[in-house]
Structures are given as structure tokens and as C-alpha cells.
Amino acid sequence: MTILGTTFGVFFSLLQVVSGESGYAQNGDLEDAELDDYSFSCYSQLEVNGSQHSLTCAFEDPDVNTTNLEFEICGALVEVRCLNFRKLQEIYLIETKKFLLIGNSNICVKAGEKSLTCKNVNVATIVKPEAPFDLSVIYREGANDFLVTFNTSHLQKKYVKVLMHDVAYRHEKDENNWMHVNLSSTKLTLLQRKLQPKATYEIKVRSIPGDYFKGFWSEWSPSYYFRTPEINNHSGETNPTLLTISILSVLSVVLLVILACVLWKKRIKPIIWPSLPDHKKTLEHLCKKPSKNLIVSFNPESFLDCQIHRVDDIQARDEVEGFLQDTVPPQLEESETQRPGGDVQSPSWPSENVVTTPETFGRDSPLRCLAGNVSAHDAPILSSSRSLDCRESATNGPHVNQDLLLSLGTTNSTLPPSFPPQSRILTLNPVAQGQPILTFLGSNKEEAYVTMSSFCQKR
């Protein structure tokens, strides 16, 4: 009997286990059933329908049986404690204005009255923006680029205004080679030189919240396809202007190098690197004693730019010429005086023929001089052909004036009244023999010259 009772007990226990695994669990024994993986994810969208916000949740495992499961949110709500989601096929959705957007909320998966799993989330940090729209690409021929523009509904919204956009484009043949550009505006410029010519490209864009709100990337916008134009410039052709400039530049550089090599030692090196003086000569000049008798002038005139020299000759000549111009008559009178009572001239009278020079005192030419004595009684007057050229000096100027006055005085005492005292001008200049020369100066060029022969014949 004992063995039979034990056998029935084991069989009954196995029957309960088999019935539980096959799904025929009794009511109230649900907690003993095997639990499935109920992990889920949620995202929020703010101001999707006017001022209402939406919260969407879904199971990560698509094979989960969602027949008797519900979602419930509690906390961070306005005026209510909890809210239930409504089921739309495989997702659970709630739209309300009662999200506080500050603080955390508790989202739970419930099977009847029992909570299977829960998550603590903040609605403001799980925001998923709406997908951009109106994506277009315009080719600008003048700028050789493509202007990409798109639009988003968040530009007119109150909360999620700051977004970061991800623009992705690829060649049509490269399926997995996407190129991404991140920007905060809704315009993008693609340069033509970075794209392949005569090719088709696909482009799309998505957004993610920035600034205060955090969250996930939005869905991709609908793709847009555009084609790049063919490049008109052929690679084989070369611009002639650019070629000419390049050749001239190369020739100029070569010419400069040749000139630098040729003129390096003679012209360039002395200017860039001047030769240093010999140290021996420098030390010799430093150690050499200066001369004792230095020629130093303390005259203030030596420090002037223009040196002033004293000239007595010009001053004396001006004085004599001024004196003679005052005393010379317009024309010389020709007169002959003879000794009264005899044919032979008296030594005390002057010669019959008076010799004068044709030059006037206004010029700088030399005066004609006649050799003779101051007294006329024993010295004949020479002809003009043998007269000597006499120069007036500044040193004998005053002496000449004195002799002239003396000679005039002596002559006046011996000459008759017919000889005018101022009809002739006598100039005395010493000659080599130390005798004075008597010269009658006249201003008339037509006056006759008395030669030596006529003078002798008359005697």
C-alpha cells in the first residue's frame, strides 16, 4: 500500500507540471508562468497637434504577445496622477496637454492589475522631432554649385526651435557611401567641383533637437535626386594667357639666377656683406699720436660757406677811373707850342705833337705810354709805335694822382696861356728804368699818331 501511494503522488505531481507548461494554468497561478521580455522604448513629440504633446511607446521585441498588455504613465502630470495609453496596432500612444515637461515620469507595462516592467523617463529628454520636408536642390550655373533647401515644422513651434540637421548625399551607384554634412540652418551649398560630372545623386535630411531639449534623430525626409551637368572645359586644352605668364615667369627666375651668379662678387656681395677693414690699419690709426702743430684758424670768416677776400686792386682802379672821367674833356685839342724867338724847341716846353691813345677810359684796354721825363726840356716824346703798355695797379693809384697834380702845376707855370690846363690828362707810371712816363689821353679815335721820324724831322 505504501508503494502504491507513493507512485500515485509522483504521477499527480508530473501531471501538474506538464499541464502548467502547456498553458493550462489555473486562475490565480499566473505569477508562476514564465515571464517574457517586455523591454520597450518611448519618445515624445511636442506640439504635434496644436498645443498637444504626444508620447509613443513600443516593445523592442516585435514577437511579444501584446493581447492583454497595457501602458500607463504616472508622475510629472498636471491635474491627474496617471494616464493610460491607447493601443494602435503595435504601438501605444497618448496625446495630452498635461505633460509638465519638468521632472521624471514612471511608465509601466501592465498585465491586468499587475505591473510587468517599468521605466523612469523625462519627457523633455526623449524628444524626437518631426521629419523635414520640401527638400529641393537648385543648380546655379554662374556660381558652379548646388543650393540645397528644405523646411521643418519646428520653425513655428514654441518649444523645440533649435535643431541640428544632418544632410546625407551619395552617388547613385554607391549605395553605402553616404557623405554627411551637419548644419543648423535649412540651406546648404554643394560645390560642383566636389561632385562627379554628369552623375545622379541622392540626398536626404533628418533633424535632432538641440539646446535644452534632448532626444533622438527624426525620420529621414523623402529622398531627392538631382543630376550634375557636364563640364565644358576640356582637360586637354590650355589657356594661352596662363601658358604665356608661366613661361615668362620661369624665364625671369632663370635670368635672375644667372645675374645673381655673375654679379655676386662684384656687385651683390659688397652691398649685402661689406668687407671688414684691416685690423692692423685700424689699430695703427688709433695708436698714432696726433701732430702737435695743428693748422687751426680761429677766424670767424673761415667757418662761413662763402669765403670773403680783400681786393685792393679793383677798388683802387675804380677810384682812378672815376677821377679820370671827371677830368677828361669830350675831345682832346691838338695844339703845337713853339719857343718864342727860335726854331729849336725849348726844353721847358712840351712837344709840338701830342701823342694820345685811341682807347677811352671807359674800357679795360691798356693805355699807351710815351717814354720821357716829367719836364719837357731834355726828354723827347717817343712815337706811339714804341710806346709801352702800362697797367694801372691798386698800389700806385694814389701816387699817380699826386704826380699828376704836381706835373700839372709845373706845366702851368711854364706854358703860355694858349695851352689849356685841362685839355690833356697826364698819367705817370713808373717804367723799368725807374723814370715816369708822360701820357696824354684822349677820347677821339681820329687823332693822328706822331711817329719817331716826323718828330726827328721837325727837330
Swiss-Prot record:
GO terms for molecular function: interleukin-7 receptor activity. Residues 1-20 form the signal peptide. Its main location: membrane. It is a single-pass type I membrane protein. CDD domains: FN3 (cd00063). Glycans are attached at residues 49, 65, 182. Residues 131-231 form the Fibronectin type-III domain. It is found in: Cell membrane. N-glycosylated IL-7Ralpha binds IL7 300-fold more tightly than the unglycosylated form. Ubiquitinated by MARCHF8; leading to lysosomal degradation. One of its GO terms (cellular component) is cytosol. A motif (Box 1 motif) lies at residues 272-280. GO terms for biological process: B cell homeostasis; B cell proliferation; cell morphogenesis; cellular homeostasis; defense response to Gram-positive bacterium; gene expression; lymph node development; negative regulation of T cell apoptotic process. Keywords: Cell membrane, Disulfide bond, Glycoprotein, Membrane, Phosphoprotein, Receptor, Signal, Transmembrane, Transmembrane helix, Ubl conjugation. A motif (WSXWS motif) lies at residues 217-221. Residues 327-357 are annotated as: Disordered. Gene3D superfamilies: 2.60.40.1870, Immunoglobulins. Residues 345-357 have a biased composition (Polar residues). The keyword Glycoprotein applies. The modification Phosphothreonine is found at residue 282. The chain crosses the membrane at residues 242-262. PROSITE patterns: FN3, HEMATOPO_REC_S_F1. InterPro entries: FN3_7, FN3_dom, FN3_sf, Hempt_rcpt_S_F1_CS, Ig-like_fold. The IL7 receptor is a heterodimer of IL7R and IL2RG. The TSLP receptor is a heterodimer of CRLF2 and IL7R. Interacts with CD53. Belongs to the type I cytokine receptor family. Type 4 subfamily. This is Interleukin-7 receptor subunit alpha.
